[in-house]
């Protein structure tokens, strides 16, 4: 088995991940972001990180995630998101603050119907079950209420 890692531009975190996996003895290959959808048929699962996971299962992630997730869906390859609890937002994706111009060039909203499950420290959840997780973790709502006005005023 081999791990295919996207470069993940512009920061290129994939380069670090491939180096760490290789150092651990895991066969890993770096794939250009634009090439990843074409390589999805070679995989058993697509594992994504997320910048934000909304209560309805919508994901905010880097540009290029939607084509990868759609290619996976079309190939019958499950898409799984791994995210820390702190990245959960207590509102649905439709209520996400508008992205600033520079953010629109870097991020996009991935619909929940492209995601099979989300893995957190609290366990694995179907996108439809995230609301119950968010409701159990009060600091998510409190933190969001503090930062949402800042995002709206930029």
Indicate where each model-derived feature is located.
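Conserved phosphate- and dinucleotide-binding cores of soluble alpha/beta proteins
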Residues: 6-154
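Conserved S-adenosyl-L-methionine
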Residues: 1-2
């Amino acid at each position: 088995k081999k791990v295919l890692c996207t470069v993940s531009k512009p920061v290129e975190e994939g380069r670090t991940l491939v180096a760490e996996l290789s150092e651990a003895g895991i066969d890993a290959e770096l794939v250009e972001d634009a090439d990843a959808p074409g390589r999805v048929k070679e995989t058993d699962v697509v594992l994504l990180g997320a910048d934000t996971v909304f209560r309805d299962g919508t994901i905010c992630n880097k540009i290029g995630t939607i084509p990868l997730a759609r290619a996976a869906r079309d190939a019958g390859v499950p898409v799984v998101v791994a995210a820390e609890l702190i990245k959960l937002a207590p509102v649905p994706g439709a209520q996400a603050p508008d992205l600033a111009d520079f953010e629109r060039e870097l991020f996009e909203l991935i619909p929940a119907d492209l995601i099979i499950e989300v893995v957190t420290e609290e366990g694995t959840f179907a996108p439809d079950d995230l609301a119950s997780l968010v409701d159990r973790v009060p600091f998510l709502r409190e933190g969001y209420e503090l930062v949402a006005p800042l995002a709206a005023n930029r």
